[in-house]
């Protein structure tokens, strides 16, 4: 009598014999090969989109901005690195200038030092940016600041500080560079927003408000500049493993100084930077780069708002309790 294990073994052998003796295996291998070739061609096309393009990156010296600089430099972009720290900008510029990418001509980045939160610095910075390579092909509004605190305890000055950095600064810089793009009938404006530009989490009010404003402004901009052949992409990442929470401001304006667990477990900034390059190459309009649960919350907010609000209230209670325990 043949045992069950033997029958399974025989059946498995017959299936493998069938696969290898027919066209199924070559067909499967062919499909895998075609898919791999498609992905390779797609990646090359995305890199070609920014090759020799003038790409401006704000907040370039740390976190996601720094990784975007590395990824776009390796793709052959001519970078204009922007930030507040001249020494850090020059250090990054030297690092990139010394690096090489196989099969790609790379370029020494230009640096422009200014504070995005200073309204008086924007016009001069925009002029300096345009002088670097003569024009701008891609503007990546990446610089930003995060916030942690209860609304009732938060100073209006903190709200203004977050809005100045996350909203008014990027808007002012975009407006300053936009006329040059319109004249050339060419350009791509990118806003690095957040999943919190689509949903609001408790104890993140100033940050969420600034990102909701960012989403709204750049959605309007997209519609208005379409006639000039200018692309606008809003990127909404979830948690990224950077120092964003460490450098966040609190209700009284002091530094938060804590690496949140969700941030520590967030996606690699390198991976997010690569996804941003891919989104630009595909000329996507609105992209959410988040894990399934945060992405689901965006739909839940629309489809089942009552449930979403209850979940947020529960989250607020838990967070409040953990702070007082």
From Swiss-Prot:
Listed GO MF terms: oxidoreductase activity
Topological domain spans for side Cytoplasmic: 1-17
Cellular component aspect of the GO annotation: endoplasmic reticulum membrane; membrane
Residues exposed to the Lumenal side: 39-325
EC number(s) stated in the UniProt entry for this protein: 1.1.-.-
Binding locations of substrate: 194
Function (record text): Putative oxidoreductase.
Protein's name according to its UniProt entry: Dehydrogenase/reductase SDR family member 7B
Species classification: Eukaryota, Metazoa, Chordata, Craniata, Vertebrata
